[in-house]
């Protein structure tokens, strides 16, 4: 988006420059035509005067004696010579004036830095930019603008457009004066980017900036304007030193050290998109120089770092249910892992995860406890085709456990279905619970697992030597609250 705006701004400036040059060309051609018309009128008037003078002289000559007639001819010839000399002098002055006016845009100095606007009175475009608060510096594309020149044909000054990049307009080249005899004083990078050179008194600043601008010019991407950030000049020297000290641009991007770079440059903390702006400015002005001088990274590594930073920026939060695998369903016959998406207890009698110790998972049927001698293999599918009751029936057929009663199968099926519904909304594993299914606690005789006639389920869970008991109601039933008693530690 920023590059498109810059490109659009450059195109608008190019169009403005072209229109100004075209208007200047039309004005000069109009002035040239007016001068030609004036000269033609003067010549015609002089010819008429000469004709009138000849006719009057002929008339007078007829009346004059022969000796005086020769004297008159000599006087007329002398006057004609004086008139021709005066006319030639006037025409030479006009040609020199037009040539001077048209050659002035060519002999301008190279683009100046912000705040420097001397010699702008010669170029109407630079004067217009400086008068409206703009920078008189021109982009590199203006070096290929049309330059008006003078061509003499039959004593008349005519103007034509020479399209192309002139040698005298190249950056760093000496410019010839109007006479074409002596080259003007060559300008330096320090004169063009004076503000960058005066940011500090570091002795290595001038050496670095000269080397940087010279390298960028040799590689065909000259620096033609001073980078601005937060309404102040961006110190390329300090920016380069800070980034190189941290291992180069790729290292800064990967480790997200732009905040330290911003502080090192004394930029305001409230600036928006500081990391993106500094990265783009560094890539434009300094990264080729870093690769050439330091070789800390390659363009392919830089692109990989940028792509990785973009992917990380699009990564969802850690609490998103799509970033973590769902908790496994009943993977063991004796175990169950319960977990919640944000650390809050599930809708059963499970306390906060921070208070739940890690216990070995164990789940037993409601009629008779199943010993640890018959575990289900770990590779049991998360959503198998057999229900939990069917799995128990299969184990009973093998002789591992006695066949459960119909009522216990219904209770176990209901309990298993309830746990599966809970697992559909769980994300992070929190604790392993020990769910007992015996009819009564071995010590106090309290019922631990019982299916009641109103489709409710009485459960008791032993957690950290604390016995929790409550009544579970089916989802969508008339009662949604949970009655829970906490007994004393066993």
From Swiss-Prot:
SUPFAM superfamilies: ARID-like. Residues 1-33, 51-76 have a biased composition (Basic and acidic residues). Residues 106-117 have a biased composition (Polar residues). Keywords: Developmental protein, DNA-binding, Nucleus, Transcription, Transcription regulation. One of its GO terms (biological process) is regulation of transcription by RNA polymerase II. GO terms for molecular function: DNA binding. Residues 1-77, 106-135, 298-369 are annotated as: Disordered. It is found in: Nucleus. Residues 34-50 have a biased composition (Acidic residues). PANTHER family: AT-RICH INTERACTIVE DOMAIN-CONTAINING PROTEIN ARID DOMAIN- CONTAINING PROTEIN DEAD RINGER PROTEIN B-CELL REGULATOR OF IGH TRANSCRIPTION BRIGHT, PROTEIN DEAD RINGER. This is Protein dead ringer homolog. It comes from Strongylocentrotus purpuratus. The gene is dri.
